[in-house]
């Protein structure tokens, strides 16, 4: 919104008119005096910001509007808008003032409206208002109803002498009105005019051409030089890469994720923050910043571990294919083709993960911002309500009491805002950590899915033999177990070293704070002694009051100057030290990263020469453990060196300042006192006493610092014990062993599985095993979130108690009532605010930590149970689908047999066919006996072949065992007594291997049995499908002969198939009709045959009517019986008394869940469980008695022998049950 106009003789200028709105006045209070608005006159319209486009340039400040939606919500919108028009030399400004009494639920009518518009510096042309001598024009309106708008407008031009170039002119407008509650309210609409200069430039085309040519030549030379150096660097790099390819032509693996520059730069950036925290000028926020840095470091460590897992999995796949090629099971061409397919799929997966990560981060950021705005809005509303209530209470108290209460209220609001900000930060960190975990789990599952899908695709294309694919998948599954164990070790190592790193950093920060406390104590002691010296001379009568005030003023001035100089020197020296520390730290860390990258590159090269995956994983384990320990040792040394340098700097400068204060006391102040006739002996006695006090104070502060340091060391040791490496590794091994037993037990429950089902089950189990680990960041963040929520809930409960006591003082205790008897409401409010502030400073009860620990344990157990339940549900669904299909086929076949019997009976009774004709029809349409006999023979052959193959495998195993022997070497030259112990030791060492072989053999037996059962079921299903098809043809033929109507046949099907749905019945009826049409097409009838069929139809019509009525009666009776049965069952269920479902926390015990550790929350409180114990769950008062069996769970991995079944007997029994 602007226009150009004359501002003088030398140039042109632009008028920028910013019209702001102070929207929505609130009627504050109901007292007789008018309260001026406390809102700042701010808005988006500023002198350097153009107004919005449109006919009227107006704006509304969002924060002001928010304040307008206060507790009364009777807002009035007051606007001053402008529009500039005309040519550059003669611009006119059209100004409009509007008062809008918006229609809200609590709006009121306004009266005695007075608008004061400042027009200083404007030449008003047309205005209905009254001008005053002070440059203000007034507008009056006696009454304004709700929903009406009052506006006035006028035109004006700017006085050329009023403003110069770049200057601003404020012309606000004010509105004063009266509400029905006799409150006078004043609103202000800021309005700013800014003059911007426009300089006319006369172009010189010759100069422009010369400048263009010179710039073009310089840029051309620079481009040529840059391309030359770039090409030279590429040539050198290409030569090095070609030499590396010549030395290692078969190394086609991708580089390790730890060699990427992104990970190194992230690590360097996070380490720079440590130096920033140590050199911070706000010691109180160091621990909070260190906590945020720990969460960021844990997230980065999770990302590094996930990248390491992906790289190892890719290398394992390449290694397995190379072993197959070397063993002759896979051709090199197929291996290259599969490697290219794997690489393409992995690249697509990485792109998908990256896109999903960006999408999730954008969504989470937007959601967190929205949540922050909502909570900030609610917090602001609560603060406004509290301020209104406090103003109402503090109306009739002294200014001192009101100022104290206002200060306490502001302090309380500041603490609440900090607590809310911390809660929002933790919630956002939890959302991000949860998103990272979900993406990591998704990537792991997709990686396994790619492997299984590519191998199945290779088998279907004929590129891979089924037995080779089976071998490869078995090796992959077995290797993935080793990979999971390796990643557990990596995670435990990272957890331990990061816990040690941040425990040491927390120790350094607190030591730094203790050192600063000691230094400040010495400074304060020296400053106190200086003033004490003057006061002692005044009390002794050697100084009068004027002299004392003069000396005190000088002493305070000198002390302030010394402290100010110390602060400035510390600030400057810390900046220099910060830069030096970062430079040295980056140099050493970068050097260490380069050394480790070289070793990791050599490890990647060694993967191509590794004999098997176990050797490759062992190399990863040793190298990563060594690198992690070396890097942590370097970072700990750098942190300690940074603290030492900072400590030396702070102590030297502080001692210098303390020495200056003491010198001021012993020289300058002593001379001033001696000039004023102070006795030397008295002065010397005071100086000696101060010297002894200084020495004692120094000794006391140093002892306190040493004691604090010992406490911090104990805290670091306790933290390291909680995150012990061996404990976490053992816990994960125990958990994986338990889940392996559970999954094997669930798998053995499956009776029949095909090869595709086995692959799907194996992939599902692999995905479940890959989720048994715990990320580094998410558990720690979740523990802090729960702790923060528990603290906020506890504090809110305490606040409610305090507010209830403030609202009803008579409910307080007698002693408290006597103490507060002489106090007024202001004293009670002050005490209430002090108690609330004290709650923020106090620690939460210990019971909250126990409650948080119980919730964390319950959440982890629920996640594990959910994985088991999901795996079990997939197996049950698979088996249920097979059983449902078989049961449906059998029921349909039984129903067809029943309908055949019914139709043949009607044909025989109506003498349409003789018995011999019926027998002939059955013999021609029912070859089921031969089908069933053939099926029985096939099943027996399959079983015999399976038993022979199993016996052959057992025989070969025993032959290998007899040929190889037990594998125990006899010790050479050893005592006979010690030979037995040595052989026994060897046998015990080989026991684990034998057990694994036995478990593998059991798994193979179960898989072979499941596959055999599935093949037998497939043969049975095919036979039953053939029988159903033949039965449908016979039913169609008989229904054509009996002339049965379609509706009657449908009701007949509903009777013999009561569990079938209407679509299934209609599909079956359509199948019968298709068979019927086939017969009709085969046997075309002539006219005489049509007349015969018509007579037959009339003959059977009576019988079908009787049968139809009987079916109707049967259906009605069956429906009534079902309704009665359902009503009785409902009544029985409602009469039962159920125990209410309680939330239980499953604690670890022998013979149950393995031991599960938790993230540390304060001091640990162990929960012992032995035998039958009564426990209080989460302090709810509910007692639960837990009984534990001392025996381990009996989980048999042996599949029971399959019982042979006689299909004919089973079919007859099922048919008899169906007819019954």
Curated annotation (Swiss-Prot):
What ranges does the record give for the region Disordered, renumbered to this chain? 38-59
Residues bearing glycans: 100, 109, 130
Upper taxonomic lineage: Eukaryota, Metazoa, Chordata, Craniata, Vertebrata
- Transmembrane ranges, per UniProt, are 211-231
Cytoplasmic side of the membrane: what ranges? Answer: 232-1220
Q: Which PANTHER family match?
A: LIMBIN, LIMBIN/ELLIS-VAN CREVELD PROTEIN
- What are the UniProt keywords, alphabetically? Cell membrane, Cell projection, Cilium, Coiled coil, Cytoplasm, Cytoskeleton, Glycoprotein, Membrane, Nucleus, Signal, Transmembrane, Transmembrane helix
Q: How does it assemble?
A: Component of the EvC complex composed of EFCAB7, IQCE, EVC2 and EVC; built from two subcomplexes, EVC2:EVC and EFCAB7:IQCE. Interacts with EVC. Interacts (via N-terminal end) with EFCAB7. Interacts (via N-terminal end) with IQCE.
CC terms in the record's Gene Ontology section: ciliary membrane; cilium; cytoplasm; cytoskeleton; nucleus; plasma membrane protein complex
The record's gene field reads Evc2
Its localization reads: Cell membrane; Cytoplasm, Cytoskeleton, Cilium basal body; Cell projection, Cilium; Cell projection, Cilium membrane
Q: Name one GO biological process term.
A: smoothened signaling pathway
Q: From which residue to which does any coiled coil extend?
A: 355-404, 563-644, 854-875, 920-1005
Q: Give a short account of what the protein does.
A: Component of the EvC complex that positively regulates ciliary Hedgehog (Hh) signaling. Plays a critical role in bone formation and skeletal development. May be involved in early embryonic morphogenesis.
Q: Give the UniProt tissue specificity note.
A: Expressed in long and cranial bones, kidney and heart. Strongly expressed in proliferating chondrocytes, osteoblasts and osteoclasts.
Q: Which residues are exposed on the Extracellular face of the membrane?
A: 30-210
Major subcellular location class: membrane
Q: Does the keyword Coiled coil apply?
A: yes
The domain of life for this entry's organism is Eukaryota
Q: Where is the signal peptide?
A: 1-29
Q: Which organism is it from?
A: Mus musculus
Q: What's its membrane topology? A: Single-pass type I membrane protein
- Tell me the protein's name: Limbin
Keyword Lipid biosynthesis in the entry? The reply is no
């Amino acid at each position: 919104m602007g226009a150009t106009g004359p501002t003088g003789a030398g140039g042109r200028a632009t008028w920028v008119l910013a019209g702001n709105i102070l929207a929505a006045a609130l009627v504050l209070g109901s007292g007789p005096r008018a309260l001026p608005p406390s809102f700042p006159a701010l808005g988006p319209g500023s002198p350097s910001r153009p107004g919005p486009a449109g006919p009227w340039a107006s704006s509304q400040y969002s924060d002001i509007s928010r304040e307008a939606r206060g507790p009364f919500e009777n807002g009035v919108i007051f606007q001053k808008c402008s529009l500039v028009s005309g040519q550059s030399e003669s611009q006119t400004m059209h100004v409009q003032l509007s008062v809008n009494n918006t229609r809200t639920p609590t709006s009121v009518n306004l009266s005695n409206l007075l608008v004061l518009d400042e027009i200083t510096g404007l030449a008003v042309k047309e205005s209905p208002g009254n001008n005053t001598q002070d440059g203000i024009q007034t507008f009056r309106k006696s009454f304004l109803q709700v929903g009406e708008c009052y506006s006035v407008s006028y035109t004006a031009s700017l006085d050329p002498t009023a403003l110069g170039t770049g200057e601003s002119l404020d012309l606000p407008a004010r509105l004063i009105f009266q509400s029905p509650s006799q409150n006078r309210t004043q609103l202000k609409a800021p309005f700013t005019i800014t003059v911007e200069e426009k300089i006319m430039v006369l172009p010189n085309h010759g100069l422009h051409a010369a400048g263009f040519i010179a710039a073009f030549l310089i840029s051309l030379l620079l481009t040529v030089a840059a391309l030359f150096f770039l090409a030279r660097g590429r040539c050198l790099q290409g030569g090095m890469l070609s030499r590396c390819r010549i030395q290692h032509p078969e190394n086609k693996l991708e580089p390790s994720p730890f060699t990427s520059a992104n990970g190194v730069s992230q690590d360097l950036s996070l380490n720079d923050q440590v130096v920033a925290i140590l050199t911070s000028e706000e010691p109180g926020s160091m621990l909070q910043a260190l906590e945020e840095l720990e969460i960021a470091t844990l997230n980065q460590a999770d990302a590094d571990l996930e990248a390491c897992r992906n790289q190892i999995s890719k290398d394992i796949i390449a290694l397995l294919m190379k072993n197959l090629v070397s063993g002759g099971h896979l051709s090199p061409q197929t291996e290259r083709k599969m490697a290219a397919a794997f690489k393409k799929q992995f690249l697509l997966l990485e792109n998908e993960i990256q896109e999903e990560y960006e999408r999730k981060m954008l969504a989470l950021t937007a959601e967190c911002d929205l949540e922050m705005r909502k909570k900030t809005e609610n917090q602001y509303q609560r603060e406004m309500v509290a301020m209104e209530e406090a103003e109402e209470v503090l109306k009739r108290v002294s200014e001192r009491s009101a100022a104290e209460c206002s200060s306490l209220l502001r302090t309380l609001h500041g603490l609440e805002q900090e607590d809310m900000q911390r809660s929002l930060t933790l919630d956002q960190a939890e959302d991000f950590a949860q998103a990272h975990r979900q993406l990591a789990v998704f990537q792991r599952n997709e990686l396994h899915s790619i492997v299984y899908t590519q191998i199945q695709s290779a088998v279907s294309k004929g590129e891979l033999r089924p037995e080779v694919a089976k071998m490869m998948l078995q090796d992959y599954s077995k290797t993935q177990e080793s990979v999971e164990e390796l990643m557990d070790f990596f995670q435990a190592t990272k957890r331990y070293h990061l816990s040690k790193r941040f425990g040491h950093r927390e120790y350094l920060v607190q030591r730094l704070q203790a050192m600063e406390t000691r230094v400040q104590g010495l400074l304060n002691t020296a400053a106190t002694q200086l003033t004490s010296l003057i006061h002692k001379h005044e009390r002794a009568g050697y100084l009068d009051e004027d002299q004392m005030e003069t000396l005190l003023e000088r002493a305070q001035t000198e002390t302030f100057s010394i402290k100010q100089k110390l602060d400035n020197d510390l600030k400057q020296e810390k900046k220099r030290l910060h830069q030096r520390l970062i430079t040295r730290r980056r140099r050493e860390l970068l050097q260490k990263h380069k050394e480790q990258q070289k070793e990791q590159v050599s490890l990647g090269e060694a993967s191509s020469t590794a004999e098997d995956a176990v050797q490759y994983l062992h190399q990863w384990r040793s190298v990563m453990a060594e690198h992690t320990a070396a890097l942590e040792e370097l970072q700990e040394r750098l942190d300690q060196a940074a603290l030492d340098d900072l400590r030396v700097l702070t102590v030297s400068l502080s001692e210098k300042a303390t020495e200056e204060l003491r010198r001021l006391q012993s020289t300058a102040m002593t001379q001033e006192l001696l000039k004023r006739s102070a006795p030397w002996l008295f002065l010397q006695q005071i100086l000696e006493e101060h010297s002894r006090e200084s020495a004692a104070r120094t000794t006391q502060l140093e002892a306190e610092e040493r004691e604090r340091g010992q406490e911090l060391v104990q805290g670091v040791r306790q933290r390291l014990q909680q995150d012990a490496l061996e404990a976490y590794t053992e816990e994960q091994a125990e958990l994986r062993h338990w889940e392996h037993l559970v999954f094997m037990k669930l798998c053995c429950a499956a009776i029949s599985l095909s090869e595709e089902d086995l692959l799907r089950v194996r992939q599902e189990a692999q995905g479940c095993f890959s989720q048994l680990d715990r990320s580094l960041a998410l558990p720690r963040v979740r523990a802090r979130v729960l702790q923060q929520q528990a603290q906020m809930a506890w504090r809110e409960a305490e606040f409610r108690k305090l507010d209830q006591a403030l609202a009803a003082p008579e409910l307080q205790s007698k002693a408290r009532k006597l103490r507060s008897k002489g106090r007024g409401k202001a004293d009670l409010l002050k005490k209430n605010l002090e108690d609330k502030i004290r709650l923020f400073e106090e620690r939460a009860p210990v019971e909250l930590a126990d409650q948080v620990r119980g919730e964390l344990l319950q959440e982890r157990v629920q996640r594990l149970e959910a994985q088991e339940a999901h795996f079990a549900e997939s197996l049950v669904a698979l088996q249920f689908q097979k059983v449902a299909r078989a049961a449906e086929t059998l029921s349909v076949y039984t129903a067809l047999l029943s309908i055949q019997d019914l139709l043949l009976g009607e044909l025989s009774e109506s003498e349409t066919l003789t018995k011999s004709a019926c027998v002939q029809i059955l013999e021609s349409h029912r070859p089921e006996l031969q089908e069933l006999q053939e099926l029985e023979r096939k099943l027996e052959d399959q079983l015999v072949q399976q038993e022979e193959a199993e016996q052959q495998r057992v025989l070969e195993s025993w032959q290998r065992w007899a040929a190889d022997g037990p594998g125990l070497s006899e010790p050479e030259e050893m005592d006979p007594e010690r030979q037995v112990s040595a052989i026994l030791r060897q046998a015990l060492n080989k026991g684990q291997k034998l057990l694994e072989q036995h478990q593998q053999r059991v798994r193979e037996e179960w898989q072979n049995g499941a596959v055999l059962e599935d093949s037998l079921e497939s043969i049975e299903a095919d036979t039953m499908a053939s029988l159903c098809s033949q039965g449908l043809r016979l039913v169609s033929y008989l229904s054509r002969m009996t002339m049965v109507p379609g509706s009657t046949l449908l009701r007949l099907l509903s009777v013999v198939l009561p569990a079938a749905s209407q679509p299934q019945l209609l599909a079956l009826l359509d199948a019968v009709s298709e068979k019927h049409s086939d017969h009709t097409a085969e046997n075309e009838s002539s006219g005489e045959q049509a007349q015969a069929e018509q007579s037959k139809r009339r003959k059977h019509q009576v019988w079908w009517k009787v049968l139809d009525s009987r079916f109707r009666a049967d259906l009605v009776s069956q429906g009534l019986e079902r309704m009665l049965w359902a009503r009785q069952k409902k009544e029985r269920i409602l009469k039962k008394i159920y125990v209410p479902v309680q939330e239980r926390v499953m604690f670890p015990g022998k013979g149950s869940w393995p031991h599960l550790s938790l993230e540390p929350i304060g001091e640990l409180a162990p929960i012992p469980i032995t035998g039958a114990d009564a426990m209080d769950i989460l302090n709810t008062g509910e007692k639960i008695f837990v009984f534990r069996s001392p025996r381990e769970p009996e989980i048999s991995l042996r599949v029971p022998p399959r019982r042979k079944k006689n299909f004919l007997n089973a079919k007859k029994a099922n048919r008899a049950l169906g007819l019954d």
